[in-house]
Amino acid sequence: MNAVQQPDIAWNRDHLDPGAEQEAVIRGITGEIAGKGFVVANLDRLVNWARTGSLWPMTFGLACCAVEMIHAYMPRWDLDRFGIIPRNSPRQSDVMIVAGTLTNKMAPALRKVYDQMPEPRWVISMGSCANGGGYYHYSYSVVRGCDRIVPVDIYVPGCPPTAEALVYGITQLQKKIRRTGTIFRE
């Protein structure tokens, strides 16, 4: 006798139908794990849940809002506890935080950094200057909102917004990532 033996299978019409075989396997697995406390989830939700716990932002501080963004990383608010660790390279980050006044000269650089980020990527606009031009809205050299250059997911209002507002905006982004069922954003 060989070390490996073929199982004794009685061939019938069910083996010709792949759907019946799949159903039999699913019934067997369901019967095996019933009542044993297994967690069943789809891959998309699992991936999105994992992403929310490890957001790596690219900080794009342009003006006074950047100071409040830095405060969010200090011990009082400590964004590291949320798994949010700032990265120095856009190729390693998945979130961009635009904080401050975006000028016409800086807009191409913002777009270039955004384009270097891997998919999926998200943008948080922090402060009234980044949201809509703010105090400098009518200046000839100011872009009236960074959403004219890059798609924005979360707007954090204020002039300047507090670190607490940024933390709240990040938690809203985490909820949005969990809620959306897409791995790649169109």
From Swiss-Prot:
Its main location: membrane. It holds the Pfam family Oxidored_q6. It is a peripheral membrane protein. Signal peptide: none annotated. InterPro entries: NADH_UbQ_OxRdtase-like_20kDa, NADH_UQ_OxRdtase_20Kd_su. GO terms for molecular function: 4 iron, 4 sulfur cluster binding; iron ion binding; NADH dehydrogenase (ubiquinone) activity; NADH:ubiquinone reductase (non-electrogenic) activity; quinone binding. [4Fe-4S] cluster binds at C64, C65, C129, C159. GO terms for biological process: aerobic respiration; electron transport coupled proton transport. Its cofactor is [4Fe-4S] cluster. Binds 1 [4Fe-4S] cluster. One of its GO terms (cellular component) is respiratory chain complex I. The keyword Amino-acid biosynthesis does not apply. The keyword Cell inner membrane applies. It catalyses: a quinone + NADH + 5 H(+)(in) = a quinol + NAD(+) + 4 H(+)(out). Keywords: 4Fe-4S, Cell inner membrane, Cell membrane, Iron, Iron-sulfur, Membrane, Metal-binding, NAD, Quinone, Translocase, Transport, Ubiquinone. It is found in: Cell inner membrane. It comes from the Bacteria. It is an enzyme of class 7 (translocase). NDH-1 shuttles electrons from NADH, via FMN and iron-sulfur (Fe-S) centers, to quinones in the respiratory chain. Couples the redox reaction to proton translocation (for every two electrons transferred, four hydrogen ions are translocated across the cytoplasmic membrane), and thus conserves the redox energy in a proton gradient. HAMAP family: NDH1_NuoB. Belongs to the complex I 20 kDa subunit family. NCBIfam families: nuoB_fam, PRK06411.1. NDH-1 is composed of 14 different subunits. Subunits NuoB, C, D, E, F, and G constitute the peripheral sector of the complex. This is NADH-quinone oxidoreductase subunit B 1. The lineage of its organism: Bacteria, Pseudomonadati, Pseudomonadota, Alphaproteobacteria, Acetobacterales.
